[in-house]
């Protein structure tokens, strides 16, 4: 399974923040090949996960990855558009690592367009859909490019945690990890660097130690 370091960091951070309990439910919007769902399932033994993916090839790959894992009974992969997804379930947690690119970078491949770009689901629509699917006491976890910081602050209310991510300690921020809900809360801001002097930082290693064998 092809993975990105920032996605792994996001999955590990979200897994550490989620408070699971018997029959707690999580929705993974745009699961791709299932990475985040598998990471959450590994760290939260009581949670049940619905992983939704619009692109058929990715959904099939996610289902295969889940079936070959020990978490097959905990993760349900759904090949559907989140905009037409109907569920009687209100989720305790929602997690999303949405597409990062704008229309200026559209691919000629329609499937890749859908999976990798924002033409299908903008941030405001994503937030509104999530509010309808999340319990009043629930939390939403989101990974976004840092260049969209102003849009994030404008569109999202009640952010409780915000982690700004640098690829290297001497580089600018390039990602931002957010936790928010419908509850009023005080914002806790922090930052993390993935690497320093060419090596993974201790903060990164601590978060990823249960997922990276080398740590």
State the predicted function of each range.
Residues 98-125:
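Mobile active-site "lid"/loop adjacent to the S-adenosyl-L-methionine
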Residues 172-215:
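SAM/dcSAM-binding transferase cores
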Residues 7, 11, 33, 37, ...:
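A general structural signal for well-ordered alpha-helical segments in protein cores
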Residues 1-16:
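Conserved SAM-binding loop and adjacent beta-strand
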Residues 10, 97, 126, 180:
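Residue-level signal for inorganic ion chemistry
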Residues 12-89, 93-96, 102-107:
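Conserved SAM/SAH cofactor-binding pocket of Class I
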Residues 3, 120-173, 178:
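Conserved Class I SAM-dependent methyltransferase catalytic core
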């Amino acid at each position: 399974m092809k993975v990105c370091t920032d996605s792994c960091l996001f999955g590990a951070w979200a897994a550490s923040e989620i408070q699971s309990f018997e029959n707690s439910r999580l929705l993974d919007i745009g699961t791709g090949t299932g990475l985040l769902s598998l990471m959450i399932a590994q760290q939260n033994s009581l949670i049940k996960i619905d992983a939704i993916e619009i692109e058929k090839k990715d959904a099939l790959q996610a289902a295969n990855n889940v079936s070959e894992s020990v978490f097959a009974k905990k993760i349900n992969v759904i090949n559907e558009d989140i905009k037409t997804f109907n569920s009687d379930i209100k989720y305790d947690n929602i997690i999303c690592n949405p597409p990062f690119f704008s229309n200026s970078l559209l691919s000629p491949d329609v499937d890749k367009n859908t999976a990798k770009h924002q033409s299908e689901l903008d941030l405001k629509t994503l937030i509104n859909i999530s509010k309808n699917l999340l319990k009043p006491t629930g939390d939403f976890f989101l990974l976004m490019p840092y260049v969209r910081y102003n849009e994030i602050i404008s569109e999202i209310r009640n952010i409780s945690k915000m982690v700004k991510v640098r690829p290297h300690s001497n580089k600018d921020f390039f990602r931002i990890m957010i936790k928010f809900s419908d509850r009023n809360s005080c914002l806790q801001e922090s930052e993390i660097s993935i690497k320093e002097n060419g090596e993974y930082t201790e903060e990164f290693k601590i978060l990823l130690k249960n997922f990276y064998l080398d740590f």
